[in-house]
Structure formats: C-alpha cells, structure tokens
A protein has these predicted regions:
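Conserved binding/catalytic microenvironments
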Residues: 2-258
Length: 258
C-alpha cells in the first residue's frame, strides 16, 4: 500500500523507522517524532489516511526543513507557539501535496468536476483531506475554483476555516445555523448541496457532509464533524454538486448570514 511505501521511503532515505503503537489511555497522541531515536510513532487509533498524511509530512520535514525555516523568517509571529503551528500547517500542506500532486490532482478535479468522493477514492485519501486540498489549487498558471472551507463540531463550533470564495466565515464561535454544514450533522455520511444567498446578494453553491475522526474501538466512540465546501454560483457549471440544483430559482435559495 501507499502507507507502506511512505514508511519504506522514510527508512531508506532518512533512516527513520515508523512504528504503529497503541497510546497510553492517559497520554493520547496522533504523532510523535523521536529525533534522537529516529522513530516516528503513529497512533493505532488514527485512520490509515491520517497515518499516510503524517508520514508524508515527515518526508516533507526531512527534505524541506531548511527551506521552510527560511520562508518563516519573512514573517513576524506574536509568539513561538504561533510560529510552530504555522510550520506544522506548512508541513501538512507539503504532505498533502505528496499524496495529491498539484498537476495530477488539478487534472482529476477538472475531469471529475470536483466530485470529492471520486477524488477521495482516486488518491486513497480522506474526504476532509480532499476537501482541504481543492482549496489549495491557486497557482496563477493552473488555478482551480476558489472555494471556501469550514469544519464544525457537534456543538456548532468552527474548528477550521478558509475562504477564497469571498464569503465571510466567523473567526470565533459558530456561523449562521441555516448553513448546510450544520444540517449535515442530522444525516451522517450524506452529501447535502444547496444554493445560499448572503445578505449582500451574493450567491454560493455549497455542500456539506459529516466525517468521523479516528477509528472505532471497544469502549470508545468516534467524534463526528461536519465539513463544508462552497464557491460562488458563477462556478456552478464546473462543480458537479450543482447539477441537480436550479441556480436561478429564487424559491430554493437559502438566505444565510455570517
């Protein structure tokens, strides 16, 4: 599998051994890199897709750490912690690029009209990873649709947000309860598509679907999150989920606020 190939690459190129381990109950973790032992510990409670991303991100760190550190010197950070989090985000971006190479991924997105489940199957990644990756297709020479992306928990709190579509996503707390990213929580695993209209008149096509984090195991329940992805209505013909929607039917528009 690709996971085995990534682990083999880490071992052959950088001498890093990947070990799948069961974390102690009071010390949960998803990933730990023990630099002195050159061991990457990955939790057996993480999904295979998450493990692949961690392994790919470690490859990115080993191969591009100097370049990333130089890039970070261009910015001022309010704290060391914020700089550390930014570096983690960059490494995860690079890891996703290893799993879903830009040109190939862009080509498949165009061919499949951003069908996230087909893309998920093609690249053997998770629904959330694919949804996040489509927001990164912003090379001026080979651009994709400018999407917005958000992730919410069962309590309605936004834990991830990103917007290139122009829609405003609250920085703190939750968003408008009429967004389908919330109604999706009532129908787990089902993709919901809708046309939304903001108070300023802008229209968006958006989809939402729940995802499960981690893997099921005895005595523990998986956490449920909802992923929302959308774009301006003018891109509807390029977005497969708009095919059963009447973009011009005002009666089906869902008025939403921030």
């Amino acid at each position: 599998t690709r996971y085995i190939a990534l682990c083999d690459y880490l071992k052959s190129e950088y001498g890093i051994s990947v070990k799948d381990v069961i974390p102690e109950e009071k010390k949960p973790f998803s990933k730990i890199y023990q630099k002195n032992k050159k061991e990457l510990l990955l939790s057996d409670y993480s999904s295979l897709e998450t493990k692949k991303l961690h392994a790919a991100a470690q490859i990115a760190q080993e191969g591009s750490d100097k370049e990333i550190e130089e890039y970070l010197t261009k910015f001022k950070f309010p704290s060391d912690e914020s700089k550390k989090l930014t570096k983690v985000a960059l490494l995860n971006y690079c890891g996703a690029a290893i799993l879903m190479p830009y040109k190939l991924f862009h080509s498949e997105c165009k061919k499949l009209k951003y069908d996230l489940e087909l893309l998920q199957n093609t690249f053997a990644t998770s629904f959330e990873q694919v949804a996040h990756r489509v927001t990164c297709l912003q090379d001026p020479k080979l651009p994709g649709i400018p999407f917005h992306f958000l992730r919410v928990d069962m309590a309605g709190n936004i834990s991830k947000r990103f917007s290139l579509s122009g829609i405003e996503i609250p920085r703190y707390g939750g968003a408008c309860p009429r967004w389908n990213v919330y109604s999706a929580l009532t129908r787990p695993g089902v993709i919901q598509a809708a046309v939304s209209k903001m108070s300023n008149g802008e229209k968006y096509v958006g989809i939402a679907r729940t995802v499960e984090k981690g893997i099921g195991r005895f005595g523990q329940s998986k956490s449920i999150l909802s992923i929302g992805l959308g774009c301006e209505a003018k891109y509807a013909k390029e977005f497969i989920y708009s095919e059963n929607l009447n973009i011009n039917d005002k009666s089906t528009e869902i008025p939403i606020g921030v």
